[in-house]
Every structure is written in C-alpha cells, then in structure tokens.
C-alpha cells in the first residue's frame, strides 16, 4: 500500500464530522447494578473501507471497528469523550441539526459525570431517545424501558430537560478547512449528461440529510454560487453546474488539494 501524507486540522475534523460523524446515546440492559438500563454515549466516524489508511492515521482515542465494507472509529470512554471530544467541538463548532445533536450528547455526558441516580437517567432517556432522525426506536421500545424502571422503583417524578433551554452558541463562519472536511465526507465532483444537445456537464455536489438543509444554504452563501434542492430520499443537495462558477469559485477553494480521503486523487 502506498504511504499517503494526511493534513488533519481541527476544522477539517469538524467538517468531516458534519458529513460522516455521529453522536449516539444507547440504552443498554444490564443484569447487575441498581438500574436495569444505563446510557452509553458514543462518538462515531464512519467511512468506506477504501479509506482504511486514512482512518488508521486519524485514529487517536477510541477503537477501530470493521463492519462489512466500512471502517469505524468509535469513542465510548467517558473520560475520552469528556476530555477530548467535547473540548474539540466546543471550540470548533458544528452546524445545523448536527450541532443540536452534539449539545444533547454533551448534556447527557455532563449529567452522567455529575450523578448516576434514577432522576438523571430518566431525564437522559426523555431528552435524547429520539434524537437520531433515522432511528429504529419507537414509543413501544421506550415504554419497555420505562416499564422495567417503574416495576422496580414505582412511578418516579422527574423534571424533564427542555432542549430549547440548552445553551447553544452560534456556529463559527465557514472556512476552507471545514469545507475540505465536509467535501471529503459528503462532496463529489462529477460529470452529468444533459439530454438537450447531448451535453456533458461537470458538477460539484454536497449532500446532507434534509434536517441539515441550512448547512448547504451556508455553503451556498460561502461560495456565492450554486443551488440547494430537496430530494425525495429525505436528503438535500447543494449543486453547482455553471462552468464559470466552477472555474472561478469552486476550483479555487480546493486548489491546494488538502483532501485526506481518496478525493485527493481527483483531478480538479
């Protein structure tokens, strides 16, 4: 395997996480301990196996896991999340829905650091059980957890945490390193075929979940070109097809070719 040089920066990691990272809180059953379930926060980065070399180089805290054609960096240690992950994203902020997911995740970790008794667990469950828009969790699976809690302790009164009351600073302005990370994860440089006059049309695209449409609108403002479309697959797409915009606005943004994925091999 040819050795590659990588250019990991703080803002690149944030952009890359915006594309292919996630903040997850699982609720695991346990046989021992006071509570029948416990929350387990995880920070996850996922890539196709072809990016194995990059992920191995990027890997610091956490562990590497392989799943079919994917490689994942998963950080579950509460100390690593508290001392490495949270300080990073506090200083190099995400955008849109993923920023909101991060703040819920952070709130859960801080609550776990401050106490592990019953009321915080119920607050955590109420706060983040349905955070992930693609979750398979249902009201029935949530009820099953609550039933086990109430069967053991009886009905417990607790004060729910309102997400809108959490302190969320504004995102920093977009910069080049963030853009490179975002495109490394969710961007592409393609050629399309137009039926009219059988034209070949180059295009630059970035795709996000529809809940993060605002991120693409920020990119549109940053590059001062392109359009944002909502697709039927619950995703939104930012696209630049105008050749003048591609040459004068998009290509100069990436002229230094600081990509860390195999997009570095693309000819821009």
Swiss-Prot record:
InterPro entries the UniProt entry points to: Homing_endonucl (IPR027434), LAGLIDADG_dom (IPR004860), LAGLIDADG_Endonuclease (IPR051289)
Enzymatic class: hydrolase
Coarse class of the protein's main subcellular location: mitochondrion
Gene3D superfamilies per the UniProt record, alphabetical: Homing endonucleases (3.10.28.10)
Gene Ontology CC: mitochondrion
Protein's cellular compartments: Mitochondrion
MF-aspect GO terms: endonuclease activity
UniProt family annotation: Belongs to the LAGLIDADG endonuclease family.
General function of this protein: Mitochondrial DNA endonuclease involved in intron homing.
Extra remark: Encoded within intron 1 (LRI1) of mitochondrial large subunit ribosomal RNA.
Protein name: Probable intron-encoded DNA endonuclease 1
